[in-house]
Amino acid sequence: DTPQGRLKTEAMLRSFSKMKYDAVAFGENEKVFPRNYLYPLVKENKTPVLCAASEKRRSLSITRSDIKLNIGVDPAARHEGNLNLLLSDKPVSEAKLINGWDVIITSSGEELEEPLENNETIIAAGYPKGKNLGILKLRIGINGKVMGHDHRWQPLGKEIKEDPLVRDILNDYDSKVARLLREAERPLAGATYSGVKKCAECHQPFEESWKDTRHAGAFQTLEKAGKSSDPECIKCHSVGFGEKGGFYSIETTPDLANVQCEECHGLDRGHLDDFSKPMRPVTEKVCLKCHTEEHSPDFDYPVYLEKIKH
Protein backbone atom coordinates (compact mmCIF):
# COMPACT_ATOMS: atom_id res chain seq x y z
CA ASP A 1 0.00 0.00 0.00
CA THR A 2 1.91 3.02 -1.29
CA PRO A 3 0.81 6.46 -2.52
CA GLN A 4 1.70 5.51 -6.10
CA GLY A 5 0.00 2.14 -5.70
CA ARG A 6 -3.21 3.93 -4.73
CA LEU A 7 -2.97 6.23 -7.72
CA LYS A 8 -2.59 3.18 -9.98
CA THR A 9 -5.61 1.50 -8.43
CA GLU A 10 -7.75 4.61 -8.82
CA ALA A 11 -6.71 5.00 -12.47
CA MET A 12 -7.46 1.35 -13.23
CA LEU A 13 -10.92 1.40 -11.61
CA ARG A 14 -11.81 4.63 -13.40
CA SER A 15 -10.67 3.09 -16.70
CA PHE A 16 -12.63 -0.13 -16.12
CA SER A 17 -15.72 1.99 -15.51
CA LYS A 18 -15.25 3.97 -18.73
CA MET A 19 -14.69 0.74 -20.69
CA LYS A 20 -17.86 -0.73 -19.13
CA TYR A 21 -16.28 -3.93 -17.82
CA ASP A 22 -18.81 -6.64 -16.95
CA ALA A 23 -16.74 -7.85 -13.98
CA VAL A 24 -13.49 -7.07 -12.16
CA ALA A 25 -11.90 -9.62 -9.82
CA PHE A 26 -10.09 -8.61 -6.64
CA GLY A 27 -7.42 -11.09 -5.54
CA GLU A 28 -4.24 -11.27 -3.49
CA ASN A 29 -2.79 -8.01 -4.84
CA GLU A 30 -5.76 -5.99 -3.58
CA LYS A 31 -5.45 -7.31 -0.02
CA VAL A 32 -2.73 -4.72 0.71
CA PHE A 33 -5.35 -1.95 0.67
CA PRO A 34 -7.63 -1.31 3.67
CA ARG A 35 -11.32 -1.82 2.93
CA ASN A 36 -12.24 1.70 4.04
CA TYR A 37 -10.10 2.96 1.16
CA LEU A 38 -10.85 0.40 -1.53
CA TYR A 39 -14.61 -0.13 -1.34
CA PRO A 40 -15.66 3.54 -1.37
CA LEU A 41 -13.52 3.80 -4.51
CA VAL A 42 -15.37 0.84 -6.03
CA LYS A 43 -18.72 2.43 -5.19
CA GLU A 44 -17.67 5.80 -6.59
CA ASN A 45 -16.70 4.26 -9.94
CA LYS A 46 -19.62 1.82 -9.98
CA THR A 47 -17.17 -1.01 -10.67
CA PRO A 48 -18.72 -4.52 -10.82
CA VAL A 49 -16.23 -6.05 -8.39
CA LEU A 50 -16.10 -9.70 -7.33
CA CYS A 51 -14.06 -10.79 -4.32
CA ALA A 52 -13.78 -14.25 -2.75
CA ALA A 53 -12.20 -13.03 0.49
CA SER A 54 -14.82 -10.61 1.80
CA GLU A 55 -18.51 -9.93 2.24
CA LYS A 56 -18.60 -8.58 -1.32
CA ARG A 57 -20.35 -10.63 -3.98
CA ARG A 58 -18.51 -13.66 -5.27
CA SER A 59 -20.37 -14.03 -8.55
CA LEU A 60 -22.73 -12.20 -10.87
CA SER A 61 -24.97 -13.19 -13.76
CA ILE A 62 -25.29 -11.49 -17.13
CA THR A 63 -26.97 -12.47 -20.40
CA ARG A 64 -25.20 -12.22 -23.74
CA SER A 65 -26.74 -13.47 -27.02
CA ASP A 66 -29.48 -15.23 -25.02
CA ILE A 67 -26.85 -17.15 -23.05
CA LYS A 68 -26.84 -16.85 -19.26
CA LEU A 69 -23.30 -16.37 -18.05
CA ASN A 70 -22.23 -16.80 -14.44
CA ILE A 71 -18.96 -14.99 -13.66
CA GLY A 72 -17.36 -15.90 -10.35
CA VAL A 73 -14.18 -15.67 -8.30
CA ASP A 74 -14.98 -18.47 -5.85
CA PRO A 75 -14.76 -22.05 -7.20
CA ALA A 76 -17.82 -22.85 -5.05
CA ALA A 77 -19.90 -20.14 -6.78
CA ARG A 78 -20.73 -22.24 -9.84
CA HIS A 79 -24.34 -22.04 -11.10
CA GLU A 80 -25.90 -25.13 -12.63
CA GLY A 81 -27.52 -24.47 -16.01
CA ASN A 82 -25.40 -21.39 -16.77
CA LEU A 83 -22.22 -20.95 -18.73
CA ASN A 84 -19.69 -20.66 -15.90
CA LEU A 85 -16.58 -18.45 -16.10
CA LEU A 86 -14.13 -18.26 -13.20
CA LEU A 87 -11.70 -15.35 -12.73
CA SER A 88 -8.68 -16.44 -10.71
CA ASP A 89 -5.19 -15.31 -9.72
CA LYS A 90 -4.14 -18.87 -8.93
CA PRO A 91 -1.33 -20.48 -10.96
CA VAL A 92 -2.29 -22.74 -13.84
CA SER A 93 -1.25 -25.83 -11.85
CA GLU A 94 -3.91 -25.01 -9.23
CA ALA A 95 -6.50 -23.99 -11.82
CA LYS A 96 -6.26 -27.51 -13.27
CA LEU A 97 -7.57 -28.88 -9.97
CA ILE A 98 -10.81 -26.86 -10.19
CA ASN A 99 -13.66 -28.83 -11.74
CA GLY A 100 -17.06 -27.92 -13.15
CA TRP A 101 -16.27 -24.55 -14.72
CA ASP A 102 -16.52 -24.02 -18.47
CA VAL A 103 -13.78 -21.38 -18.60
CA ILE A 104 -11.12 -20.26 -16.13
CA ILE A 105 -9.16 -17.07 -16.83
CA THR A 106 -6.05 -16.65 -14.69
CA SER A 107 -4.02 -13.54 -13.90
CA SER A 108 -1.12 -15.37 -12.28
CA GLY A 109 1.44 -13.79 -14.62
CA GLU A 110 2.11 -17.07 -16.42
CA GLU A 111 2.16 -16.83 -20.19
CA LEU A 112 -0.04 -19.29 -22.09
CA GLU A 113 0.34 -18.92 -25.83
CA GLU A 114 -2.85 -20.95 -26.29
CA PRO A 115 -5.60 -21.92 -23.82
CA LEU A 116 -5.41 -25.35 -22.21
CA GLU A 117 -8.24 -27.88 -22.14
CA ASN A 118 -8.44 -29.76 -18.86
CA ASN A 119 -11.37 -31.99 -17.83
CA GLU A 120 -13.80 -30.10 -20.11
CA THR A 121 -12.56 -26.76 -18.78
CA ILE A 122 -10.81 -24.17 -20.94
CA ILE A 123 -7.99 -22.45 -19.04
CA ALA A 124 -6.76 -19.16 -20.49
CA ALA A 125 -4.37 -16.54 -19.13
CA GLY A 126 -4.07 -12.80 -19.44
CA TYR A 127 -0.94 -11.52 -21.16
CA PRO A 128 1.81 -10.20 -18.85
CA LYS A 129 1.52 -6.41 -18.31
CA GLY A 130 -1.48 -6.29 -20.64
CA LYS A 131 0.67 -5.89 -23.75
CA ASN A 132 -1.71 -8.08 -25.76
CA LEU A 133 -5.47 -8.47 -25.55
CA GLY A 134 -6.68 -12.05 -25.42
CA ILE A 135 -9.79 -12.73 -27.53
CA LEU A 136 -11.54 -16.01 -26.73
CA LYS A 137 -14.58 -17.00 -28.80
CA LEU A 138 -16.71 -19.90 -27.60
CA ARG A 139 -18.88 -22.12 -29.78
CA ILE A 140 -21.97 -23.03 -27.78
CA GLY A 141 -24.15 -26.02 -28.63
CA ILE A 142 -27.95 -26.13 -28.40
CA ASN A 143 -27.54 -27.78 -25.00
CA GLY A 144 -25.70 -24.72 -23.71
CA LYS A 145 -22.38 -26.54 -23.50
CA VAL A 146 -19.09 -25.32 -24.96
CA MET A 147 -18.44 -27.27 -28.17
CA GLY A 148 -15.18 -25.57 -29.13
CA HIS A 149 -13.27 -22.32 -29.05
CA ASP A 150 -11.06 -19.96 -31.03
CA HIS A 151 -8.35 -17.83 -29.48
CA ARG A 152 -6.01 -15.11 -30.66
CA TRP A 153 -3.82 -12.34 -29.28
CA GLN A 154 -4.41 -8.77 -30.38
CA PRO A 155 -1.20 -6.73 -29.91
CA LEU A 156 -1.93 -3.38 -28.28
CA GLY A 157 0.61 -1.39 -30.25
CA LYS A 158 0.55 2.07 -31.76
CA GLU A 159 -1.73 0.87 -34.55
CA ILE A 160 -4.57 0.61 -32.00
CA LYS A 161 -6.27 3.97 -31.58
CA GLU A 162 -6.34 5.22 -28.00
CA ASP A 163 -9.62 5.87 -26.25
CA PRO A 164 -9.60 9.61 -25.40
CA LEU A 165 -11.44 9.08 -22.11
CA VAL A 166 -8.91 6.51 -20.91
CA ARG A 167 -6.01 8.63 -22.17
CA ASP A 168 -7.32 11.50 -20.01
CA ILE A 169 -7.28 9.18 -16.99
CA LEU A 170 -3.70 8.09 -17.71
CA ASN A 171 -2.55 11.67 -18.20
CA ASP A 172 -4.13 12.57 -14.87
CA TYR A 173 -2.32 9.62 -13.27
CA ASP A 174 1.05 10.73 -14.68
CA SER A 175 0.47 14.28 -13.40
CA LYS A 176 -0.36 13.04 -9.90
CA VAL A 177 2.71 10.77 -9.85
CA ALA A 178 4.88 13.72 -10.89
CA ARG A 179 3.38 15.71 -8.01
CA LEU A 180 4.26 12.89 -5.62
CA LEU A 181 7.88 13.11 -6.73
CA ARG A 182 7.96 16.88 -6.31
CA GLU A 183 6.46 16.66 -2.83
CA ALA A 184 8.65 13.76 -1.71
CA GLU A 185 11.49 14.45 0.68
CA ARG A 186 14.64 14.78 -1.37
CA PRO A 187 17.53 12.50 -0.29
CA LEU A 188 20.37 14.30 1.43
CA ALA A 189 22.82 15.95 -0.91
CA GLY A 190 26.42 14.91 -0.81
CA ALA A 191 29.55 14.43 -2.86
CA THR A 192 28.72 10.85 -3.72
CA TYR A 193 27.89 10.12 -7.34
CA SER A 194 30.31 11.76 -9.75
CA GLY A 195 28.60 11.24 -13.10
CA VAL A 196 29.98 10.17 -16.45
CA LYS A 197 31.83 13.45 -17.06
CA LYS A 198 34.08 12.86 -14.07
CA CYS A 199 34.82 9.31 -15.22
CA ALA A 200 35.59 10.59 -18.72
CA GLU A 201 38.47 12.67 -17.41
CA CYS A 202 40.51 9.46 -17.39
CA HIS A 203 38.30 7.11 -19.44
CA GLN A 204 37.39 9.26 -22.44
CA PRO A 205 37.35 6.37 -24.96
CA PHE A 206 34.91 4.49 -22.72
CA GLU A 207 32.63 7.52 -22.59
CA GLU A 208 32.60 7.67 -26.39
CA SER A 209 31.64 4.01 -26.71
CA TRP A 210 28.99 4.44 -23.99
CA LYS A 211 27.38 7.24 -25.99
CA ASP A 212 26.58 4.70 -28.72
CA THR A 213 24.65 2.41 -26.34
CA ARG A 214 20.99 2.50 -25.37
CA HIS A 215 22.09 3.16 -21.79
CA ALA A 216 23.13 6.65 -22.87
CA GLY A 217 19.60 7.46 -24.02
CA ALA A 218 17.73 5.66 -21.25
CA PHE A 219 16.15 8.76 -19.76
CA GLN A 220 14.98 10.05 -23.12
CA THR A 221 12.87 6.90 -23.51
CA LEU A 222 11.02 7.90 -20.32
CA GLU A 223 10.47 11.43 -21.60
CA LYS A 224 9.00 10.10 -24.85
CA ALA A 225 6.67 7.81 -22.88
CA GLY A 226 5.63 10.57 -20.48
CA LYS A 227 7.18 8.70 -17.53
CA SER A 228 10.11 10.98 -16.69
CA SER A 229 8.60 11.76 -13.26
CA ASP A 230 7.56 8.20 -12.39
CA PRO A 231 9.73 6.86 -9.53
CA GLU A 232 9.12 3.24 -10.55
CA CYS A 233 10.66 3.99 -13.94
CA ILE A 234 13.32 6.54 -13.01
CA LYS A 235 15.23 4.11 -10.79
CA CYS A 236 16.40 2.10 -13.81
CA HIS A 237 16.95 5.04 -16.13
CA SER A 238 19.27 7.17 -14.00
CA VAL A 239 22.14 7.01 -11.51
CA GLY A 240 21.53 6.55 -7.79
CA PHE A 241 17.86 7.53 -7.72
CA GLY A 242 16.60 7.61 -4.13
CA GLU A 243 20.12 7.56 -2.68
CA LYS A 244 22.25 10.28 -1.12
CA GLY A 245 23.71 12.44 -3.87
CA GLY A 246 21.91 10.50 -6.61
CA PHE A 247 19.51 11.54 -9.35
CA TYR A 248 16.45 13.47 -8.18
CA SER A 249 14.93 15.14 -11.23
CA ILE A 250 16.00 16.18 -14.70
CA GLU A 251 15.76 19.83 -13.62
CA THR A 252 17.95 19.53 -10.51
CA THR A 253 20.35 16.68 -11.37
CA PRO A 254 20.58 16.48 -15.18
CA ASP A 255 24.17 15.17 -15.04
CA LEU A 256 22.94 11.94 -13.43
CA ALA A 257 20.27 11.11 -16.00
CA ASN A 258 20.63 7.92 -18.09
CA VAL A 259 22.36 4.67 -17.11
CA GLN A 260 25.92 5.81 -16.47
CA CYS A 261 29.17 4.24 -15.24
CA GLU A 262 28.40 4.18 -11.52
CA GLU A 263 24.99 2.57 -11.95
CA CYS A 264 26.70 -0.56 -13.29
CA HIS A 265 30.20 -0.40 -11.79
CA GLY A 266 29.00 0.84 -8.41
CA LEU A 267 29.68 3.84 -6.23
CA ASP A 268 33.29 3.84 -5.04
CA ARG A 269 34.78 7.19 -4.07
CA GLY A 270 37.98 5.39 -3.14
CA HIS A 271 38.70 4.83 -6.82
CA LEU A 272 39.12 8.59 -7.28
CA ASP A 273 41.68 8.67 -4.49
CA ASP A 274 43.54 5.59 -5.69
CA PHE A 275 43.15 4.80 -9.38
CA SER A 276 44.80 1.40 -8.90
CA LYS A 277 41.74 0.32 -6.95
CA PRO A 278 39.42 -1.24 -9.55
CA MET A 279 35.68 -0.69 -9.72
CA ARG A 280 33.42 -3.71 -9.33
CA PRO A 281 32.91 -5.96 -12.36
CA VAL A 282 29.53 -5.90 -14.06
CA THR A 283 28.12 -9.32 -13.18
CA GLU A 284 24.79 -10.74 -14.26
CA LYS A 285 23.42 -10.00 -10.79
CA VAL A 286 24.08 -6.29 -11.34
CA CYS A 287 22.14 -6.30 -14.61
CA LEU A 288 19.20 -8.24 -13.16
CA LYS A 289 18.35 -5.37 -10.82
CA CYS A 290 16.70 -3.70 -13.79
CA HIS A 291 16.61 -6.33 -16.53
CA THR A 292 13.90 -8.33 -14.78
CA GLU A 293 11.62 -10.91 -16.35
CA GLU A 294 8.81 -8.37 -16.22
CA HIS A 295 10.63 -5.48 -17.87
CA SER A 296 13.22 -7.29 -19.99
CA PRO A 297 11.89 -10.78 -20.81
CA ASP A 298 14.44 -11.34 -23.60
CA PHE A 299 17.45 -10.50 -21.41
CA ASP A 300 20.44 -12.71 -22.12
CA TYR A 301 23.50 -11.68 -20.10
CA PRO A 302 26.27 -12.58 -22.61
CA VAL A 303 24.33 -11.04 -25.52
CA TYR A 304 23.43 -7.84 -23.69
CA LEU A 305 26.91 -7.47 -22.20
CA GLU A 306 28.38 -7.51 -25.70
CA LYS A 307 26.14 -4.55 -26.62
CA ILE A 308 27.67 -2.33 -23.92
CA LYS A 309 31.19 -3.73 -23.96
CA HIS A 310 33.96 -1.09 -23.79
Task: Label each residue range with its predicted role.
Residues N29, V49, I142-H310:
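Short sequence/structural segments immediately N-terminal
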